[in-house]
Amino acid sequence: LSPSSAASDVYKRQAPLALTYKAINTMDSMLGYKNERYLYFGRVPAKLDDVANYIPSRLAGLLWVAAAAFTHNDAKGAWKIWRRDRRRHASPNSAQTESACAGALGVQLAGPAYYFGEYYAKPTIGDPLRPIEPEDILRANRMMYVASAFALAWGVAIRTVL
């Protein structure tokens, strides 16, 4: 096999998986609501999305802890809050990166919210060591970029070995 045909074979195997993942993710976004209209029909894509993102979300949480150290944020705080609060959400995957970010920044995130005009009491994530400020958006973005670079490097390394 030539290098180009070998690469083509890899893409042919991966494309259906990527499309399946995207379909699951989109169905969850559109139908995975816990309201009367979608409660039963939306449960399947919501659970499939939980399964599909179980490992990636945890790896992403760890990458955010590492990114905190490289962006001069509080890596120890990120680790502590990630370990403590990563399960403080109705979805098993949603608080993984959010908790690491909250710990790295020393802020409290989440909490009560309104959806479709209805109040929902939700747990907070992180400790309110200081008030949230606009600069935190830039700090979180930097951590996101560094965590993404780590994930890309990790993927390239795995792909090179395999």
Task: Say what each PLM segment does.
Residues 156-162:
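Juxtamembrane boundary at the C-terminal end of a transmembrane helix
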Residues 35-135:
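Membrane-proximal soluble regions of multi-pass membrane proteins
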Residues 8, 146-153:
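Hydrophobic alpha-helical transmembrane segments of multipass membrane transporters and ion channels
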Residues 23, 27, 31:
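Active-site His/Glu-centered metal-binding helix of metallohydrolases
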Residues 1-7, 11:
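Single conserved hydrophobic/aromatic residue that forms the stacking wall/gate
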Residues 140:
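C-terminal binding/interaction regions
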Residues 12-24:
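Membrane-embedded alpha-helical segments that form the functional core of polytopic membrane enzymes
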